[in-house]
Amino acid sequence: MPTGAEIILPWWLFVLMLALAVLALLDRLFVPSVRWFWRRRINRVVDEIGQRLQIEIRPFQLTKRQVLIDRLVYDPKIIEDARKLAREKNEPLELVQAQVAKYAREIVPAFNAYIYFRIGYWIAKQVAHLLYDVRIGLAHKAALQSVPEDATVVFTMNHRSNMDYVLVAFLAAERTTLSYAVGEWARIWPLQTLIRAMGAFFVRRNSGNPLYRSVLERYVHMATHEGVCQAVFLEGGLSRDGRLRKPKLGFLDYMLRSFDPQRDRDVVFIPVGINYDRVIEDRSLLRSLDQGAEKRSLWFVVRTTVRFILKSFWLMLISRWQRFGYACVNFGEPVSVKDYCREHAIDFRRLPRPERFEAVAGLARVLMEDIRREVPVLPVPMLAAVFDAHPQSWMTATQIERRAVKLLNRIAARGANVYQPGRDRRPYYVAKALDLMCMRHFIEEQDGRYRLNPSVADIMRYYANSVVLASEGKGIKPETAAEKEPLDAPT
């Protein structure tokens, strides 16, 4: 080719070469600088937050995700289970190990402290305060502060709403980070990425796959052994009728089956009670109990949700938005597993499977009773209990208040931790709750008197059940004849 001859390239090839050159430049010059910038910023956030957290971020949470996946895949117990399964199914071990790796990638989170505290915390706080008047009701501060710094703290909670994840993560963020087990419903983009970055991990509810359960068990064991603070819904799912469900023992068993009370760090359970003046999913939860109800399509669910969101935004724009009342969380007294094992002469490691499950069930009963006592008694559920007890009666606000106070006193007398508002604040709480209930057509109002709307008696009982469970098992005594008041029909 003669010197100085022109070389003609197609435009598409020139653009492609230019793009590759730019990418190479970015990869060699800019990407390392950006990576260094973000790493320094994240480390600064971790150091800053670590100074104010009561329970510090564990090294396990800051370990690279791929390292944790490899630890899980090559865990001796999982390798043993994989070999056993390969022999039983007459499959190559490599095929079974590939399945193990898939499960490990599915389960292991990708905790990012910057996203957790700078993005996740901000979103949780804004959403919680947008929807509710958020309160921490009762907290045993001295007992909570006495928890050893190296202990594995596990918040055990009742599951009232999907808002529980947001509410507890936001309220506990001043003390620690939380790792949740989240159902497969949340495995959609971009929610899946955000949830993993927040330290949560996905689980397949009611999975009967022994290999999957083995991988999940070892991950829970690793996280517990390394001191990761966790949040567990012992019921294993949302309450459908407002009452506490029977506890699921799987996660407790995973945490405790290898627990050495002499050498391992202590595992401390903190009972948490959650309640709302309005549960966003209340009608859907009740509908799920109706076996004859027509199944709603995905399109119906999406359409209804979008309409609800748009209506809420419109009410905000015209300054007519009202929050859904109170959302309250009570933190109970910690339960030390080491102390529990010592008091009951239990070593979970040495028990055969049936006896171990019975011992785990005994601890679960203790925790559920503690949770039951901590469930907050809020204005709307309290008034719902009053209306549910007197479905045909027309009552004035004063009569409703008196009946609510009597019920509150009976619940408190049976050991439930309830907040007793001052006498001068009671009319305010009653009036606010009545407004919320009228707005949702739970009650009928006529000439300053109120009565239960018969068409929503099931929803009223759903809210009333959260009050009854505060002393469930001991029963709430009915009013005596002397306590009852004459209730006149409106004129």
Listing of model-derived features with the role each one plays in the protein:
Residues 1-231, 236-491:
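Membrane-interfacial terminal anchoring regions of lipid-handling membrane enzymes
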